[in-house]
Amino acid sequence: MGWARLESALGRVPEGVDVEVRWRPYEIHAEVQPEGMPVEDLPYSPEQWAQMQEALRQSAAEEGLEVGKRPKVSNTHRALMAGEYARVEEAERFPAFHEALFKGYFAEGRDLGDPAVVEDIARSAGLDVGRMTKALDGGEYEGAITATTDTARQLGITGTPTFVFDKRFAVVGAQPVEALLQAIDEALKHTEEE
C-alpha cells in the first residue's frame, strides 16, 4: 500500500519537479528462520492476527490491491538480496521484479524464503536467473542488506514502509497520499532555501 500511495503522490507532484526514488532493502524480521514462521507462532492471538489481516485487506482494497492469506511469515533475506541484485545489476528490470515480489507475497501468499519461489519471480520479471543465483549464492549482496538495515536502525527506522525525503523528513507507515505530498513539499521548501 505504501508503494501505491507513493506512486499516487508522485503523480501529483508539479510538472518540472524531479523526484528521485531510491529503494533500499530493510530486513524487518531477521530472526525468522529460513523455513519461515507459522502465523500461529507470532506474538498475537488468533483474533488479533485476523483483525490485523482484515484491516490490511481493507486498506489494500482502497488502493486497488489484493492481500491474500499467508500461512506463515517468510524469511525475506534472499528476496531482499535478489532485489538488491536487480537494482544494481539489472536496473531496468528492478521495478517489475519489486512489484512481482510484493504481489507474490501479499496477494498470492508465496513463500519468499524459498529460493525456487524467488527464482520463479525473478524469471517472470525477466531477470537473468543464473547470474542472479550465482551472485546470491556467492554472498555478493549479503553486506548490502546488513549495511542498509543497520543504517536504517541507527536512523530510528524500525518498520516498512518508511519514506525519507531529502535525507531530512521521514514518513513512516502506509500513510495517506496527502502526508507524502506534505513531506515532498517540505523537502522542496528546504531545497529552495539552500
Per-segment meaning from a language model:
Residues W3-Y105:
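Structural alpha/beta surface segment adjacent to cysteine/selenocysteine redox centers
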